[in-house]
Amino acid sequence: EASQAQRDWIKNYFKIPYSLRPILTERMPNLFLNDEEINVIGDYMEKVFIADSLELQIKTDQTKITKGKILFYEKYGCQGCHQINLKGGYVGPALDKVGSRLRPGWIFHWLKNPQAFNPESIEPDNQLVDDEAEALTAFLMSLK
């Protein structure tokens, strides 16, 4: 969904699709689209699928990033399911370059209530307060 992914990432993904979750062997097939076709798809996704309610600016100063990193590794143990630099679990998507892939507003709202986006998601709803969700978002956005 376009509310989730950044435009440049969408374009690159359509050029060279890959599996987002290490545990899954399924992936989007390569459709061998040219740049013009990819731009048309990107334009369509941005016009139709972006939810304005998910647009949000998150401060990504070093203090927030550090707090988010502590929350990720120490308080919530996110590395149990997610990999960063090939370290961590295999259940959730690898987060190495998540800051280049996802939009900050989407990350924030996903962290606050994952089941609102996908009722079958196994991502835990940790009942994050806004400050924690902002810090985790800042940390994740720093991963590029």
Spans of model-derived segments:
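Intrinsically disordered, low-complexity segments enriched in polar/charged residues with Gly/Pro
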Residues: 56-57, 81, 113
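Sequence/structural segment immediately N-terminal to covalent heme-attachment motifs in c-type
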Residues: 60-84
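Short, charged low-complexity linear segments at domain edges
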Residues: 45-62
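Short helix-capping and inter-helix turn/linker motifs at the boundaries of alpha-helical repeat units
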Residues: 19, 58-59, 85-86
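Extracytoplasmic electron-transfer domains, predominantly the class I c-type cytochrome c fold
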Residues: 1-48, 89-143
